[in-house]
Amino acid sequence: MLFRSALVAQSKRSPGSMNYASPGNGTPHHLAMELFKSASGLDATHVPYKGIQGALTDLVGGQVQMMFGTVHSLKPHTQSGRVRLLATTGTSRSAQAPDVPTFKEQGIAVMDHVDAWYAVMAPARTPSDLIQRLNRDFIEVMNQDDVKAALTQQGMVVRPSTPEQLGTLIKSDLARWKKVVTDARIAAD
């Protein structure tokens, strides 16, 4: 909670003085920060880059004050002491940064399910029995210890699901991000 109140207080004390990087307009990083701004009252200006590398370079160099990024991509910079992780999204702490509290632990529950996810998709007319068989096969592979370990090392959390659960997640994310885009008046470049 300390970091949030300090950030918000600083942004109120000097309006327009704080900024944040993202790898581009409308990216998950951009939307996550807009959701955080809305939930916390933070006043910060978006600085969109053409990709993650420029955003990270300017964060490390101090040209921007903050950004959302994956723990995995920020880890080399945190280990060198050039970047400090302030909070993680998700319902539990990151295995790669167990000492960093979640947003929820710091009083911002709206960031709980802000995370990147990967899914395997098939064409809409794929037969249901084939979808179910492929899903079972993918779950079997994802539950193998060596696969879990490799993905965890890359900062991912293995959460296999059913096609129906994926459909629910997609609908829920679309509704949440549509509201963020509308409220923040984000327009396509």
Language-model region placement:
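Small-molecule pocket liners
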Residues: 18, 44, 83-86, 91, ...
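Ligand-binding "clamshell"
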Residues: 42-43, 77-88, 95-108, 180
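Short helices/loops that flank or line small-molecule/ion binding pockets
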Residues: 11, 35-39, 53-67, 72-80, ...
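Paired acidic/hydrophobic, glycine-rich loop segments that form the ligand-binding mouth/hinge
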Residues: 19, 65-69, 84-87, 177-179
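A local structural motif
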Residues: 16-19, 38-51, 55-65, 155-160, ...
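An extracytoplasmic/periplasmic, membrane-proximal ligand-sensing/linker region
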Residues: 38-42, 79, 105, 128-189
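Beta->alpha turn/N-cap motifs
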Residues: 52, 69-74, 89-91, 116, ...
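Hinge/capping helix and adjacent helix->loop/strand transition within the periplasmic-binding protein
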Residues: 1-54, 103-108, 117-150
